Amino acid sequence: MEQFKNFENIPFECSSSLNLISVHPSLIEFARSALKTNHVRLYQAQAWAKFTGEADFDQAFHCDFGNHTLTVPSKDECLNSITFIIYFTDVTEAHGPTHYVNRTDSNNIEGMRRFLKHREDLQHQKELRKFERSAAGPAGTLLAYGIDVFHRGTNLTEPGGYRYAMTSCFKKAGNDAIGYTSWPWHFAKPWHNIFEHATPDQLNCFGVPLPGDPFWTEETLSLAQLRYPKWDMSEYL
């Protein structure tokens, strides 16, 4: 799809700051609080650049559970996940802000059931638009929402406009019902940019065992150091 032309998984061949923004300590703590657990995993993180006229970015309202789980959202929010959208540029209404509908409003019109019964229900889309809110904001704005929250992308109309953002999705560790990215599948990407700069807590979000875990033996420590020669493993010894 054209609108996903500039949509790329981490890690990138660039600064450690951009590579690690998705596991910023504040986001990790936010996710832990929202999911009511001390153990979270990052299962999606992508940079997304949009430019005026490059594609039709206008979307219908949808929920992310469709490609984040093979089942449906749970009433227990701890069994779902939390998604962050981080703006790196100022985003006005002319720069394609995400629009969303509060869960209370969508529930009042049987949002989830109607969506599952008929995803192309135009009347449902019209009703959702009556309640839509804008996530427009200056650079640094953070939008947090769950996989059961209706939202949609909007078009950029500012001449020469652009929008730089990142998505970051967390789930409770061990929740196999939620997924998106298998990080090892992207083994050819520059993971050294993450391993050489991340804390053990940040690496744990990718599934790397914490220091003291039984996984770490003299053998695994030695082999891991060979794989990432510049990784400071002193905390794991």
Which residues make up each language-model segment?
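Non-heme Fe(II)-dependent double-stranded beta-helix
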Residues: M1-P73
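Secondary-structure boundary elements
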Residues: R32-R41, S74-C78, F88-H95, N107
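Short, structured patches in soluble enzyme cores that scaffold and shape functional sites
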Residues: Q46, C63-F65, I82, I86-D90, ...
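Short edge-strand/loop segments of extracellular domains
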Residues: K50-F51, V101-N108, R163, C169-N175
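A short secondary-structure junction signal
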Residues: E54-F61, L70-P73, A94-R103, I109-R113, ...
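Double-stranded beta-helix
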Residues: C78, V91-R152
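Non-heme Fe(II)/2-oxoglutarate
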Residues: V149-L237
